[in-house]
């Protein structure tokens, strides 16, 4: 897999987060749909981690380890956010859409940083 394809997976995850943030902001409501969207984003990040792991196995000199660790960190934070807005909790407690949008903004910044880390990896001897 090329570096461009790897970055495309990260970009897709970033776009998914952006869509969740826009949905919450526009509705001014956190829904179970948002929970499902975050689960999809988590799955995308899991795919990204798998691709990075495969390439890491091939070349220890590619500089992928930091990207892998950061991908795992972002995935865990998104999983935690999805757990925070789980459907059973949404029925029992009001969750502030503003707070969720702020949390999603933080994760979007983390995705931008991940993209920067992915820029620094080398695959196949090319940057």
Annotated model-derived regions:
Residues 2-127:
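Long, low-complexity or tandemly repetitive, helically biased scaffold regions used
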């Amino acid at each position: 897999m090329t570096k461009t394809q790897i970055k495309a997976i990260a970009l897709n995850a970033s776009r998914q987060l952006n869509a969740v943030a826009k949905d919450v902001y526009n509705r001014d409501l956190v829904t179970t749909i948002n929970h499902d969207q975050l689960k999809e984003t988590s799955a995308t990040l899991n795919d990204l981690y798998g691709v990075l792991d495969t390439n890491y196995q091939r070349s220890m000199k590619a500089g992928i380890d930091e990207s892998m660790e950061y991908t795992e960190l972002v995935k865990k934070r998104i999983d935690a956010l999805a757990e925070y807005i789980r459907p059973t909790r949404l029925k029992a407690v009001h969750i502030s859409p503003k707070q969720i949008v702020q949390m999603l903004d933080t994760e979007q910044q983390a995705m931008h940083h991940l993209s920067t880390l992915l820029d620094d990896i080398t695959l196949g001897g090319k940057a």
